[in-house]
Swiss-Prot record:
Annotated residues for binding of ATP: P84, L85, A86, R87, G88, L89, G90, S91, S92, S93, S94
Superkingdom, natural source: Bacteria
GO CC, any one term: cytoplasm
Protein name listed in UniProt: Homoserine kinase
GO MF annotation terms: ATP binding; homoserine kinase activity
Catalytic reactions of this protein: L-homoserine + ATP = O-phospho-L-homoserine + ADP + H(+)
Function in brief: Catalyzes the ATP-dependent phosphorylation of L-homoserine to L-homoserine phosphate.
Length: 296
């Protein structure tokens, strides 16, 4: 059995903690067979546990405990990932979704998508990454008082270009620079921008969507000092035809929405700056979680 989960890019500027997209980088978890102890083979670095301390297995345990179910065996697993760690592309969320599905398959829980999303939001705390990782495409979601409501929609046709810096930025560190509260006036302004962003995405108006992404009042202005590449890439985007540029998740990845016919030019112009990092031309993943050789 093989579980495949896409990377994600959250917030899209003003859609803080509620809007995300799935993109075509993947985490894969393969069940190799039963084992005396839980064991995970991976090449993700020595700081990533290979036993029950791994997020994959702590998630599995949380699901089994929630459902009051126990497994009769332990398993040898293989985990491979194209998703850069701690870069704002949902690496932890993809593992959480994989862990939920692993529990679903091994314990034959037959969970619905809504049940999986509820569990994921309880573990992660907000839906912006876990929802598109599970469902694919563009997802707009809200979790209030433990209840998650969501809409899945096709993302407007365009190219995506991600600049992934070589340095990590943990979400907890990126959240420390955010204010504890906004004034009522600030909240109304930020909300109105997010509303227009959402409407523009749902009506395929990328010009307006790009403007609203860059007008965010919730988080980007506070985090910009942590990601010096953001402003430079935004300026390059303005000069060479990008629809918009935003900080992916908590950063440090910067995402550009680009007309298909401008992708090559923008890639060349960014490469000319010799920034320390990698460029990834990406596409929307419209499938979300996939399971090969499912037990169901």
């Amino acid at each position: 059995m093989k579980i495949i989960v896409p990377a994600t890019s959250a917030n899209l500027g003003a859609g803080f903690d509620s809007i995300g997209i799935a993109v075509n980088l993947y985490l894969t978890v393969e069940v190799l067979g039963e084992s005396r102890d839980w064991k995970i083979d991976h090449d993700l670095g020595e700081n990533i546990p290979t036993d029950e301390r791994n997020l994959l297995l702590t998630t599995l345990s949380a699901v089994l405990e929630d459902k009051n179910v126990a497994l009769s065996a332990k398993f040898h697993l293989k985990m491979t990932s194209e998703v850069p760690l701690a870069r704002g592309l949902g690496s932890s969320s993809s593992v959480i979704i994989a862990g939920i599905e692993l529990a679903n398959q091994l314990a034959k829980l037959n969970l619905t998508s809504d049940e999986k999303l509820k569990l994921a939001c309880e573990i992660e705390g907000h839906p912006d990454n876990v929802a598109p990782a599970l469902l694919g495409n563009l997802v707009i979601a809200s979790t209030v008082a433990g209840k998650t409501s969501h809409i899945v929609a096709d993302f407007p046709s365009c190219a995506l270009l991600a600049f992934v810096p070589d340095y990590e930025l943990k979400t907890v560190e990126s959240r420390k620079v955010l204010p504890n509260e906004l004034t009522y006036k600030e909240a109304v302004a930020a909300s109105s921008i997010a509303n227009v962003l959402t409407a523009s995405l749902l009506t395929n108006n990328l010009e307006v969507a790009g403007q609203m992404m860059e007008a965010d009042r919730f988080h980007e202005s506070y985090r910009a000092s942590l990601i010096p590449e953001l402003q430079l890439l935004r300026e390059i985007g303005h000069e060479f035809g990008a629809y918009g540029t935003y900080l992916s998740g908590a950063g440090p990845t910067v995402m550009l929405l680009v007309p298909d016919d401008k992708l090559t030019l923008l890639t060349e112009k960014i490469m000319e700056k010799n920034l320390t990092g990698h460029l990834y031309p990406l596409k929307i993943d419209n499938k979300g979680l996939q399971v090969e050789e499912s037990v169901f």
